[in-house]
């Protein structure tokens, strides 16, 4: 893995690949809204670099290559935004109104036309 992560206090214990936003009762919480501009990152699996390593909390990938939970079809190079499915991302569809440009947080590294919830490799921007 090749990501840069930092620990943040979370309001629950989230598994790696979960998309999180700033908010909730602690510093971060699971995303549940499409194109949420509060996106913080993705819960990291094994960060290459971990900031605030002595702090409690979950490692949130801020940059680099990580597995990300997604729903819907994605193509290599697609921009990813938060989805309405809690903790998951989806591909940004260019023709769809999506709110803030600040809601884009990653790019897909794979072509995957599955529609079931799953993990894919992506680069956090």
Model-derived regions: residue spans:
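Extracellular receptor-binding modules and their adjoining Ser/Thr/Gly/Asp/Asn-rich linkers
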Residues: 1-125
